[in-house]
From Swiss-Prot:
Coiled-coil residue windows: none
A family per Pfam: OTCace_N
Record protein name field: Aspartate carbamoyltransferase catalytic subunit
GO MF terms held by the record: amino acid binding; aspartate carbamoyltransferase activity
Gene3D superfamilies: Aspartate/ornithine carbamoyltransferase (3.40.50.1370)
Organism: Psychrobacter sp. (strain TAD1)
Cytoplasm found in the keyword field: no
Entries under PROSITE patterns matching the protein: CARBAMOYLTRANSFERASE (PS00097)
Family of the protein in this entry: Belongs to the aspartate/ornithine carbamoyltransferase superfamily. ATCase family.
Annotated gene: pyrB
PANTHER family: ASPARTATE CARBAMOYLTRANSFERASE, ORNITHINE CARBAMOYLTRANSFERASE, MITOCHONDRIAL
């Protein structure tokens, strides 16, 4: 999906040229499998769900289900790392030296001096994790903790785990409605890609036109104009947060008008299937994106999404560690 986000403050000019916003998503989605996988198909870096096939996504879910009984705390990579005994460095580049003008490559070289096996990277520039995976030394693996508008693959996979565990029907039989700020949401991109890979054929999206990427129909989703029609007979209703911090100018008339047109209300939930799941990646804007009675209601699995996050992150860390060992064995 096109990305017009200005990322020049986060990478050097030469690096930025490699990630032209007009082509970033198409280019990344067609190339992610190359640095992401070893020759045997094991995961070398976890950069996005787009580069993985159905069996590989199912393997992540299966690994997460193995870890699930021990996950009772809030979703953080730190919890997962401690339970696995992994030597992991968590990086929020936006709050590091990049703010002072240091290039992404220089940041990476400095970080490599710290003895860590895996870097979990969050960056405001689309493609940053992909860039680091191509530049990092062979003994370090990269996990994408969210890059710009491009992808949030661990959130996407914890959403798939939640649907797998809670939905009464298999992926192939589900209708999923995604509501809200798709344009600025890396979660939406990862969810749409994962849902399609796992066999969901009916993916619906609705938002004000200002919050939809241009040409979104090309990505195999149905765009709706009417909220009631969008959620009717759905199995999963997924709200998205309005990304105010990524919106350069006002794109909404008002919060109250947005809620009136696109809010997930009890009346609209009643139009979906009786056992429909209510999801949201958080944080929620109650009374804008979703009614409190829905967020806290019996069909909501929002807190289960949170608790499933630890299992997914443990699964991703474990599979990445296995892939890293395989990569090192092949080199040796």
């Amino acid at each position: 999906m096109p990305n017009t986000h200005d990322t020049k403050n986060n990478v050097s000019p030469s690096e930025y040229a490699k990630f032209d916003p007009s082509t970033i998503h198409q280019r990344l989605n067609t190339s992610l499998s190359r640095p992401q996988l070893n020759s045997d198909g094991s995961i070398r870096h976890f950069l996005g769900v787009e580069g993985l096939n159905k069996a590989q996504l199912q393997a992540i879910i299966a690994k997460a289900l193995f870890f699930e009984p021990s996950t009772r705390t809030r979703t953080t990579f730190e919890v997962a790392e401690k339970r696995l005994g992994a030597n992991v460095l968590n990086l929020d580049i936006a709050s590091s030296s990049a703010k002072k003008g240091e290039s992404l490559r220089d940041t990476l070289w400095n970080l490599q001096a710290m003895t860590a096996d895996i870097f979990v990277v969050r960056h405001s520039a689309s493609g940053a994790a992909h860039f680091m995976a191509t530049e990092v030394t062979p003994d370090i693996a990269i996990i994408n903790g969210g890059d710009g508008w491009h992808a949030h693959p661990t959130q996407g996979m914890l959403d798939m785990l939640t649907i797998h565990r809670e939905a009464p029907r298999p992926f192939e039989e589900l209708s999923v409605a995604i509501i809200g700020d798709v344009k600025h949401s890396r979660v939406a991109r990862s969810d749409i890609s994962a849902l399609q890979t796992l066999g969901v054929k009916d993916i619906r999206v609705i938002a004000p036109r200002t919050l939809l990427p241009k040409g979104i129909e090309r990505f195999g989703v149905q765009v709706y104009e009417d909220m009631n029609s969008c959620v009717r007979d759905c199995d999963v209703i997924m709200g998205l947060r309005i990304q105010n911090e990524r919106i350069g100018s006002p794109l909404l008339a008002s919060s109250s008008e947005y809620y009136k047109q696109y809010g997930i209300t009890p009346e609209r939930v009643a139009l979906a299937k009786p056992d429909a799941l209510i999801m949201h990646p958080g944080p929620m804007n109650r009374g804008v994106e979703i009614a409190s009675s829905v967020a806290d209601g019996p069909q909501s699995v929002i807190l289960k999404q949170v608790s499933n996050g630890v299992a997914i992150r443990m699964a991703v860390l474990a599979l990445t560690m296995e892939g890293q060992r395989a990569h090192q064995a092949n080199r040796g």
